[in-house]
Design a protein with these regions (language model features):
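Phosphate-group recognition and catalysis centered on beta-loop-alpha active-site segments
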Residues: 1-250
Length: 250
């Protein structure tokens, strides 16, 4: 069965709402627990750093939208971030949920046999790698970078890691991305996914991760990804996917 990757948020044209949006607030342990409940094999998260160099899980660069704090997380000390309420905005029953530290997420994932996809935002790459290694989770993490130079730097720092993801817009971009970044996993939007795209990725020994994201019904798109034999399907609604296809294997 296809592993499913669940984000800690989902994107729409007008707003950002949490992964499994009817279940739990993003960037919290409650969100992780909901993924565990539904058997999600891989949790994608955005990693950013505090003023005192502690890594947190937060999609936005600021705390305003999902906590009772304001301003950039990079200007906050971890001792203060840890006091913020990251759940009340979503529903009263989640009052008191905290912004999730990467360390706590890694430990929870290790306990439950989950993979974590790290979407790097800022902070020391070496510090990030050391933290993941210290928690014994390097072999259970995927890595993705929005900036090409960060991906290249990461590849040089950790050549042994075989889970570097790279966004590829279309089939014609595969050669360039492979040459420049040497990725292990091709990430592609479902609308750009074709049989030839998958074939070319296989020729380069790339796994394929299909992005099937958004708030609307994705039944047809999910089936397309399954039929084309992708390795991972990223979804904002893991509970619906698993209801149809069953719990994934990691």
């Amino acid at each position: 069965m296809f592993p499913t990757a669940c984000r800690h948020h989902q994107d729409t044209p007008d707003q950002r709402t949490p992964c499994a949006a009817t279940i739990a607030p993003e960037n919290t342990m409650a969100s992780v627990d909901s993924c565990i409940k539904y058997g999600v094999g891989n949790i994608e998260c955005d990693v950013c750093i505090s003023k005192d160099s502690v890594f947190y899980i937060l999609h936005d660069s600021t705390l305003d939208r999902t906590t009772n704090g304001t301003g950039a997380i990079s200007q906050w000390l971890s001792t203060d971030i840890d006091t913020l309420d990251a759940g009340s905005w979503f529903a009263p029953r989640f009052a008191g949920q905290r912004v999730l530290r990467l360390t706590d997420l890694l430990r929870k994932a290790k306990e439950h046999g989950l993979r974590i996809t790290i979407d790097y935002r800022n902070g020391s790459l070496q510090q990030l790698l050391n933290l993941i290694k210290d928690e014994g989770m390097l072999e259970n993490c995927n890595f993705t970078f929005s900036k090409e130079q960060h991906a290249k730097c990461f590849r040089k720092m950790a050549p042994e890691v075989r889970t570097l993801q790279a966004y590829i817009k279309s089939e014609k971009d595969i050669e360039h991305v492979v040459k420049e970044l040497h990725p292990d996993i091709a990430v592609v939007w479902i609308d750009s996914l074709t049989p030839q795209f998958v074939k070319r990725c296989r020729e380069h020994n790339l796994q394929v991760l299909a992005l099937v994201l958004g708030p609307d019904d994705k039944t047809e798109e999910n089936q397309k990804a399954v039929d084309l034999g992708v390795d991972i399907i990223a979804t904002d609604h893991p509970e619906k996917f698993i209801m149809k296809y069953g719990k994934p294997s990691i």
